[in-house]
């Protein structure tokens, strides 16, 4: 068997790409990409186009609730939160605008539980001074059927760019970003000191109370996150500040949290190191789509579409998305992995009049096996 091994150092960042059909495994600080003797069958499917969003908006995030796709947030020029809420009905392939968020934010963590969408933290505009990202600790419950919002007990920690997942009827908010200690201002701005967080906080909807849990070993923001079989998988993300500009640090780490044991372990890294990606789970398989990267020469969003099997700790590279995008709506409904909206390149720069990098495009990976 021909084996290719990529030795990782430091945090184990792997930037080399593997061709389709290879199985990625992690052993003693090395990642091996190799044809398997008895390969686990990767998911099969195709990309299809579906009804576009009512408008092109970046930084919308979504969850599946009662067979529909519920999306919220959005980010406008000048770091202004859009506060949008949309609902997509796959039966009619149609979007509907819903009641806006009571307190518009962007980069809030979202999760679905018991026919509701929960939203935690995020960033709003600072009350004064130049535009920036002001982290908040808001917690909200949204009922799509009633089109109604309910304020919950705020999170103990103010942060944005975190992720959330559900295990055992409780919600876990993980990671995120905020100012460094003694920064003098809670607001973060590009190229100013800021930090990633490893904070983990558990919310119990039955009691409307929070409690702190074991911190994530490698703090990050803008990762993907899914819960499968009682474990939470935090995938990729940004190791430095919240902004992609001026803060390199995309990772392919996969950090798995067991709420029952309140402990963390590291799993096989994702083939593509990226942040601003989105994730969804279908039939026990985690799908990771898109993301962004930036250096002095490239302002890029990814078309990468990869799948992870937590049982075998195996990654596959699947057919790429039709469009590159990051920070988009993503959720599984039926046999489809929906992705919609987002931005098709990575940038926090003023754009010439008439030029936009957000998209209203909506596509889905239709899983056949």
Give the label of every model feature segment.
Residues 2-14, 21-369:
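Kelch-like beta-propeller repeat domains
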């Amino acid at each position: 068997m021909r084996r290719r091994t990529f030795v990782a150092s430091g945090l184990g960042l792997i930037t080399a790409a593997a061709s389709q059909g290879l199985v990625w495994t992690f052993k003693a600080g090395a990642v091996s990409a190799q044809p398997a003797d008895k390969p686990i069958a990767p998911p099969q499917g195709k990309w299809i186009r579906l009804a576009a969003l009512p408008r092109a908006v970046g930084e919308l995030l979504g969850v599946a609730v009662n067979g529909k796709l519920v999306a919220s947030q959005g980010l406008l020029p000048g770091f202004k939160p859009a506060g949008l809420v949309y609902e997509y009905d796959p039966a009619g392939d149609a979007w509907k605008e819903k009641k806006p968020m009571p307190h518009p934010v962007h980069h809030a963590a979202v999760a679905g539980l018991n026919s509701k969408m929960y939203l935690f933290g995020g960033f709003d505009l600072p009350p004064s001074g130049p535009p920036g990202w002001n982290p908040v600790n808001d917690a909200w419950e949204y009922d799509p059927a009633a089109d109604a919002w309910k304020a919950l007990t705020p999170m103990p920690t103010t942060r944005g760019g975190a992720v959330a997942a559900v295990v055992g009827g409780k919600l876990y908010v993980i990671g995120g970003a905020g100012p460094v200690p003694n920064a003098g201002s809670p607001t973060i701005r590009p190229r100013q000191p800021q930090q990633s967080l490893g904070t983990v906080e558990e919310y119990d909807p039955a009691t409307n109370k929070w409690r702190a849990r074991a911190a994530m070993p490698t703090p990050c923001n803008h990762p993907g996150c899914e819960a499968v079989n009682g474990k939470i998988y935090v995938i990729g993300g940004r190791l430095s500040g919240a902004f992609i500009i001026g803060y390199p640090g995309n990772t392919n780490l996969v950090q798995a949290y067991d709420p029952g044991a309140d402990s963390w372990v590291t799993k096989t890294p994702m083939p593509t190191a990226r942040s601003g990606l989105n994730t969804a789970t279908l039939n026990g398989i985690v799908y990771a789509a898109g993301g962004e990267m930036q250096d002095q020469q490239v302002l890029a969003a990814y078309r990468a579409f990869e799948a992870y099997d937590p049982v075998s700790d195996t990654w596959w590279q699947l057919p790429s998305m039709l469009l590159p995008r990051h920070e988009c709506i993503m959720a599984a409904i039926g046999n489809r992995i929906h992705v919609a909206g987002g931005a098709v390149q990575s940038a926090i720069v003023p754009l010439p009049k008439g030029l936009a990098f957000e998209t209203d495009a909506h596509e889905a990976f239709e899983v056949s096996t």
